Regions:
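Carbohydrate transferase catalytic cores enriched for Leloir-type hexosyltransferases
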Residues: 1-365
Length: 365
């Protein structure tokens, strides 16, 4: 397992791992974790659960050791069922397992992680093996389910959609929120992006769209780009620094959850120009704070966000600018979008996700 500081999949792992054992005291749960990728305080939370054991598995994800040494470690435990929370299951593991496939992005878009041909072949072999051998596949949206069917040739009946939730709920008190916003020198209204800075996030076009918004509509606002830089895509940060109004870009790397909650609470709206997603967790987090969403017109965003979002052409910075402007001068429309956002957020819960995942475990054992 990886920790919640490692983007959407890490969050997914931690939220399920911290909930499912509390729903099921008839079984023992063993969590394999990489010590360099899990926060000590999160390990303590899991260790304190009476039916949980923790085993260190310090193998780099997507590595040969993961396919061999981790395989040996799994076989030593004589497990009744394994849940691999991402596609990278050892291809020679032949005991019952469930796998979560969050998306098929690497089949759709090139990136540094798969640019070398042999790496891409390995990815395709591993994900195909996991999908074929799993008793059940969990995915996080109907859009991803359709992609899994299309690219892996898996029947619909084998795939179960279990929606994710948001762990950032409620509100931050005003004093704390102001302190955190002052910490990051946020003195102007701001749009907020949250996510790992991968190529698929299309951050450059988002920044260009915001740049056009400033040029065209002359509003005094910032774009806060918040999240975890990806070492495989260093060019993204370099290109962001070449934007004309780069002084209006506020870059916040890897904030703590309390800071992130305050950043959501203080934002004018959430925005993302992502090209492909499996779910879109940051937008769901934003909805919990009643933020209107201004996002790319992708199938998964339409599915998950529905009427809580304004949609733009992610390849057209001018359209991004125009859609950002829609919320500025119409307070009635802005408040209507806030209400829609809060109403939509009620359909997403980690407690429900944990319950549905446990039900799936019981079906396949």
């Amino acid at each position: 397992m990886m920790g919640k500081q490692h983007g959407g999949i890490g969050r997914y792992v931690f939220e399920l791992a911290s909930r499912i054992p509390k729903l099921d005291f008839q079984n023992k749960y063993i969590f394999f974790y990489n010590q360099s990728r899990v926060l000590p305080e999160d390990l303590i939370k899991l260790k304190n659960l009476p039916n949980v054991a923790l085993i260190a598995a310090n193998y780099r994800h997507y590595s040969l050791k993961e396919q061999t040494l981790f395989l040996r470690l799994l076989n030593q435990q004589h497990l009744d069922l394994v849940h691999f929370p991402n596609f990278n299951a050892p291809i020679f593991y032949d005991k019952p397992f469930v796998v979560t496939i969050h998306d098929m992005v690497h089949h759709k878009i090139s990136g540094a992680k798969k640019s070398r041909f042999l790496h891409f072949l390995a990815y395709k072999k591993i994900i195909a093996s996991a999908a074929k051998k799993a008793q059940k596949i969990i995915t996080v949206s109907e859009s991803s389910k359709t992609d899994i069917q299309k690219f892996l040739g898996i029947g619909r009946e084998k795939i179960k959609v279990i929606l994710e939730g948001s762990s950032l709920t409620g509100s931050v008190n005003d004093k704390t929120a102001r302190e955190i916003q002052n910490k990051y020198l946020l003195t102007r209204p701001y749009f907020l992006f949250v996510g790992v800075w991968e190529r698929k996030k299309n951050l450059i076009n988002l920044a260009l769209g915001f740049n056009q918004f400033l040029e065209k509509y002359k509003f005094d606002m910032d774009l806060v780009i918040c999240g975890k830089p990806d070492a495989h895509y260093p060019e993204i940060k370099l290109k962001l620094m070449q934007i004309k109004h780069k002084d209006r870009l506020v870059i916040i790397e890897k904030p703590e959850d309390e800071d992130l909650a305050a950043l959501y609470q203080g934002a004018f709206a959430f925005t993302s120009a992502s090209l492909h997603e499996g779910f879109g967790l940051p937008g769901v987090e934003a909805m919990n704070f009643g933020l209107p969403l201004i996002v790319s017109n992708t199938p998964v965003f339409n599915e998950i966000y529905d009427n809580a979002a304004i949609y733009f052409n992610s390849q057209n910075p001018n359209d991004i600018a125009d859609k950002m402007n829609l919320l500025i001068n119409d307070s009635l429309f802005y408040n209507k979008m806030r209400e829609a956002s809060l109403a939509r957020s009620a359909g997403f819960s980690w407690d429900n996700a944990a319950k549905e995942t446990l039900e799936l475990y019981n079906q396949v054992q």
